[in-house]
Swiss-Prot record:
Signal peptide: none annotated. Residues 1-22 are annotated as: Disordered. CDD domains: Ribosomal_L16_L10e. GO terms for biological process: translation. Keywords: Ribonucleoprotein, Ribosomal protein, RNA-binding, rRNA-binding, tRNA-binding. It holds the Pfam family Ribosomal_L16. The keyword Ribosomal protein applies. Part of the 50S ribosomal subunit. Coiled coil: none annotated. One of its GO terms (molecular function) is tRNA binding. Binds 23S rRNA and is also seen to make contacts with the A and possibly P site tRNAs. This is Large ribosomal subunit protein uL16.
Length: 138
């Protein structure tokens, strides 16, 4: 699963996920993409589950790019532990997603196959997404 190799600080404050994606909002590598319409967090497990669904559907053809990386640690206290005594240990990593961010890209397959693969992947994700194609000349 995806997670940072090392971080300067183990824990991070919660923060607020606001605004629209300005970077990573265009299809850059492949011909087709899966773009976020809603906002939220994607865990490393969700990113991997969607990747597996796409890879299984396109079989040997095509290439997939993952355009997001879970770099934010989410901490949690153990069950039945009283409040206080500091922040819990990092449990898993998430990627903060803003509307407009391209999550995955695909190349080397026809549009119908790409649409179906992205539909299967979108079913694994907790945010609304849409299918996009690369602009001509970019």
């Amino acid at each position: 699963m995806l997670q940072p190799a090392r971080r300067k600080f183990r824990k991070e404050q919660k923060g607020r996920n606001t605004g629209l994606a300005t970077r990573g909002a265009d299809v850059s590598f492949g011909d087709f993409g899966l773009k976020a319409v809603g906002r939220g967090r994607l865990t490393a497990r969700q990113i991997e589950a969607a990747r597996r669904a796409m890879t299984r559907h396109i079989k040997r053809g095509g290439r997939i790019w993952i355009r997001i990386f879970p770099d934010k640690p989410i901490s949690r206290k153990p069950a039945e532990v009283r409040m206080g005594n500091g922040k819990g240990a990092p449990e898993y990593y998430v990627a903060e997603i803003q509307p407009g961010k391209v999550l995955y890209e695909m190349d080397g397959v026809n549009e119908q196959l790409a649409r179906e693969a992205f539909r299967l992947a979108a079913a694994k994700l907790p945010i609304a997404t849409t299918f996009v194609t690369r602009l001509i000349g970019s």
